[in-house]
Amino acid sequence: MKELELKYGCNPNQKPARVFVDEGDLPITVLNGRPGYINLLDALNGWQLVKELKEATGLPAATSFKHVSPAGAAIGKPLSDTLKQIYFTDGVELSPLACAYARARGADRMSSFGDFISLSDECDEATALLIKKEVSDGVIAPAFSNKALEILKAKKNGNYCVIQIDPAYVPPATEVKQVFGVKFEQGHNFIKIDESCLSNIVTKNKNLSEDEKHNLIIALITLKYTQSNSVCYVKDGQAIGIGAGQQSRVHCTRLAGQKADNWWLRQSPKVLGLQFVDGIKRADRDNAIDVYIGEEYEDVLAEGSWQRIFKVKPEVFTREEKKEWLAKNTDVALGSDAFFPFGDNIERAHKSGVTVIAQPGGSVRDDQVIETADKYNMVMCFNGIRLFHH
């Protein structure tokens, strides 16, 4: 098939809409549902991300996309008991691929609501059962087991979007887009992210473990398919905070850092001990936790409000308690899609437990940035690779 007609483009008034190729066939087959324009942008970007994560790490990978940027991305490492609890997988048998999706979805559950999922490997039953329970628009994978396909086809009253992609497909060397009637042409970004990108360590501390290398590679590959400007915090094989599409680099670092902080706060005893009313939906629980750990916590603790959410009124999670818990988060990796212009980015990263950094370098203030990293005994690599994506 050379062409797929779509219901509409980015918005309902943008008709007609289609995706097509000039030569050969489309690399995708729609097995169920009817994907939208943005769904396919998410699917094709997400597929490239997980394919490269699998190639770089050797482990199954998954990503959760919203509006053409990942909300989460991860490889299939086993989950701790705490992560199983906050990812709603307690008592569930998980395959490596299911672990990858649980991590990708669980990093920023608020942003992943209604996501489009990309999987590096054949979707198995365990992964399909996880997807079944989440609010999601669709999934793309190189294959689906019969049982997984049966489960997914029943989702959303039979309208859940399921796309199979040819894993052997290689895009043309040149890509073209059109804006306001003007065509833009550039070479496809085939740059490979691997350990060679981490060889130029510019800080005094040059000790980079294999796990830290993996985390930095995950950060950089994630950034390659994130709308710029972007930075990505990674811990234990998964993105824990992605700051996308900000005009200011330090605002990326703050946004992603706050997301990483929220991920860590969700694992605190105070949050794990919250007693929710029976029958509360996952989305309502996620929203309540997000408010509870934030500055507007009074909104869920107010009289008449907390009773709809909690069995017992929670104690305030004080600023001092949160600061004490956040100080326990360490061994976080940070990647940036372009250079850090000032040391303030490093200062903010330090607050979220960052110990290793990969960035292109090239700022006129590189010396100041390196000095700030040295102050915290961080390891920082200059890879000379800009990863802008639009």
Regions found by a protein language model. Give the residues of each.
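Conserved helix-loop functional segments at active or binding sites
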Residues: 52, 225, 262-266, 351
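Flexible, glycine/charged-enriched surface loops at secondary-structure junctions
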Residues: 56-64, 163-165, 228-235, 265-276, ...
